[in-house]
Amino acid sequence: MLACLAILAVVGLGMTRVSALSKDDTAQLKITNIEGGPTVTLYKIGEGVYNTNGDSFINFKYAEGVSLTETGPTSQEITTIANGINTGKIKPFSTENVSISNGTATYNARGASVYIALLTGATDGRTYNPILLAASYNGEGNLVTKNIDSKSNYLYGQTSVAKSSLPSITKKVTGTIDDVNKKTTSLGSVLSYSLTFELPSYTKEAVNKTVYVSDNMSEGLTFNFNSLTVEWKGKMANITEDGSVMVENTKIGIAKEVNNGFNLSFIYDSLESISPNISYKAVVNNKAIVGEEGNPNKAEFFYSNNPTKGNTYDNLDKKPDKGNGITSKEDSKIVYTYQIAFRKVDSVSKTPLIGAIFGVYDTSNKLIDIVTTNKNGYAISTQVSSGKYKIKELKAPKGYSLNTETYEITANWVTATVKTSANSKSTTYTSDKNKATDNSEQVGWLKNGIFYSIDSRPTGNDVKEAYIESTKALTDGTTFSKSNEGSGTVLLETDIPNTKLGELPSTGSIGTYLFKAIGSAAMIGAIGIYIVKRRKA
């Protein structure tokens, strides 16, 4: 009876009374505050032993392999039993699936009995640790039990461990410009990402303590592994050459650069239930997708939603698959890029002009790009984000005079209403100013062959000034078509004209014709004066 009362002290509350002492006595076992709709399975690991008449309780008989401190079953013991059930080392007396109603799983136990409840497969990714339930007699000979709150902590052993937890991941990005609730950026810009977590709650004896983070950049973003930092307990970790994540003398994980991103496996027991924070950077490259599709970047957080099944996953070469006790949460951020386009034509015939070279400038008159018109007269600059820009002709097409007018264009979600078959152009950068196109000024920075915009100078001593050495014009078949907002390309509303050398610009206005008439009269007068002087001579 004392053993029965001890287990009751652990699980007995919300008493359910019965009038007789019998192996046919019943009591309701309840688990409350269940969320996520998991599958609830009860494994009977202990059953009451009664006398031959069945009217006197003697003690509990446990399944082979079960070790339980009846005066205070610990979280470690409960987890070890659950591990044994999952591996087949412990054979329960019976197994029951229990339905959930209004967040409560209810089971009518017959006779004194002890169960391990495993809650698995929650649709919201919730992790449930094993729960001990018991129907036991009190001092008055009544079969009683306790309603167990699935969100409560263990009473014995690791009392800081909750019976359930809801892991999560939150991703943020900075270094962008907000435009109609969109995060926008431009080629060469540096983006800073941060990850924060809500860790799962595992017991010490759990066999699957996976805490694994994976992030792989999309093609338009270049990941910088050297920028990866981990902060834990207010201290910055040191990531060693072999990838070990060290905080002072404590190894809390190991990281590895994989493709265009990283995999990072944390050591759960070393984290002391304190979540780490991760940050890293990426550079927008010339493969960035323009327009409403954007450039997504997804971070995945893998963990165990069944800590007593499978094993801790720590293979850095390949992120884990879901299943066998592992699930994941993810958070994505999308950054959007724009491009501006314009068309170069003959001022009279409106024929497209090839080979005109233009500079693109920001509002502070800093050169950010150099572009060349193609056979169809079009040129595109992909090095713009949301904002205003200026277009100036640097070199006229062969046989034409230079257009000295400055054209302004605004790039944003509303004005980007054109779709084009060209998403980028090829630009070659150099750190040698003597090789710069038309002796053009600096447009950014180069480090390890990666281009950074003028306002995104990277750290380190191996950073060099970047100049545009050459640009490849758009293909002749490039198309432009009117579309909806957010299509990515802003097309200058007016064509940019050029006048042939030896021709005067004509707009058809009366002022132009008057100018021509005065010029003609002056020429005739000059010829007359010349003839008179010749005769006098």
Swiss-Prot record:
Lipid bilayer topology: Peptidoglycan-anchor
Positions carrying Pentaglycyl murein peptidoglycan amidated threonine: 507
Keywords for this protein: Cell wall, Peptidoglycan-anchor, Secreted, Signal
Residue numbers covered by motif LPXTG sorting signal: 504-508
PROSITE patterns xref list: GRAM_POS_ANCHORING
Region of interest (Hydrophilic), residue spans: 310-330
Subcellular location: Secreted, Cell wall
Cleaved propeptide residues: 508-537
Signal sequence region: 1-22
InterPro entries, per the entry: GramPos_pilinBB, Ig-like_fold, LPXTG_anchor, SpaA_PFL_dom_1, T6_Ig-like
GO terms for cellular component: extracellular region
Miscellaneous note of the record: More than 25 serologically different T antigens are found to be expressed independently of M protein, but certain T proteins occur only in association with specific M serotypes (i.e. T6 protein is always found on M6 streptococcal strains). The T protein is exposed on the cell surface when fibrillar M protein is enzymatically removed.
Protein name: Trypsin-resistant surface T6 protein
Source species: Streptococcus pyogenes serotype M6 (strain ATCC BAA-946 / MGAS10394)
Gene from which the chain derives: tee6
